[in-house]
Amino acid sequence: MEEILVFRTIIKHMEKKDVVGKIVDVIRTSFEQDGFKLKAPNKFEKRKGDSLYIYEISVTKSKTHFSLHLRLKLQNKRISTGVNTILKRVLKDPLIKYPTNFTDKVIEDIFKGRTSNKDVYGLTDWRFFKADEQTLSDFNAKFSIWFSNFETLEEKNNWQTELLQSVAYAKSWFALIDHDAYLIKHTDYVALYLLKKLDDIEGVEAKYKEIYDRKRSLDQDTEELELFYKYLLQEH
């Protein structure tokens, strides 16, 4: 009982910034050795050409514990601006119907949110790094800090080792995905935009069919996709 009270006292007096600070202290050197810089209290960033690599530490606090979620993001202004320019035309098209109970402000907020997104690709589920021959339980036993709850970081065995492993994973992920070919294979609107910029019209048509067929198989609406395809082909 005394131990529980001690933990609750610690949580009460610790803030999210304290947890973030401890994490930053562990991983900072490893990131800085590879050109990343701490650009915000919870974000390491590295610019490479037109791309921006982001490692984000998201911490939330409840009455009983902290929750940690590590996220990776790839931003590319050239690509996101191109996609968002087309998306603005799509979302203003009369064929796009919003629920009747949506106010003008809600619709405008949706429009702004959708068309100001700078992220080209991202990772939130770090089970991506599980080896094919590795069981999920084995992977989780060795690396689970990416999405975890705790009263203090210290209660989690090997928390520092796992954080350093997350840095290694992050670096390998950015090296893997920051290529047009990878993005074309693993994205939708970004892929269509990149193929159009490459003047690969056959590729655009094939990718569009792939996305369309997938959405139909999942019984998802295709109106927005069809409009994106239409306006994309009008781009010069």
What are these regions (language model features)?
Residues 1-13:
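N-terminal amphipathic/basic-hydrophobic helices that include classical n-h-c signal peptides
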Residues 7, 15-20, 46-236:
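Intrinsically disordered, low-complexity regulatory regions enriched in serine/threonine/proline
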Residues 16-40:
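Amphipathic alpha-helical segments
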Residues 39, 43-47:
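Generic recognition of long tandem-repeat/solenoid scaffolds
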